[in-house]
Amino acid sequence: MSEDIVRQTINNNTKLNLKKPKQKYLQFDAYDKNYIVEIKVRNTHYDKQIIEFSKYAFNSKYAKINDQIFVYAVAIKDIIYIFNISKLENDYDFKWEWRKLPATTEFKNNDNMLKYVGYLNLADAVTTIKIKE
């Protein structure tokens, strides 16, 4: 599964019209006039999903400055879990901590590095979308 499939599935199942940013190396993977969306595609199901503080902080601030909502979309197998981070950030306990994790999720770089991360319980997703193949 790819970010493109996730973005298109979200568009097909909501009123959003998400586009892929033209700029490289942004902290988010999709946007429309009201939302910015960070997309994660995971191969393994865990009840708690990691969110990196660097992406959380940048995207939360970027969304506020641009009067948008920051959404985190996690695709696991055939389900997309949607989190409204802009809403959660007010009172959600992300349980932030330092962890040694792979530098990237791509297999090119298996080196571990220290990252400040939090956790999202899948049960706290505002909605889920089934991916149809």
Task: Please annotate each region the language model reported.
Residues L26:
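Beta-rich catalytic cores
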Residues K22, Y31, A75-E133:
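Non-catalytic C-terminal interaction segments of nucleic acid-processing enzymes
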Residues N13-L16, D32-Y35, N66-Q68:
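Short glycine/proline-enriched coil/turn segments at helix->beta-strand junctions
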Residues M1-K22:
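Acidic-basic catalytic patches of nuclease active cores, encompassing PD-(D/E)XK
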Residues L18, V41-E89:
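Catalytic cores of nucleic-acid endonucleases
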Residues A30-H45:
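Conserved catalytic cores of phosphodiester-cleaving nucleases, focusing on short active-site segments
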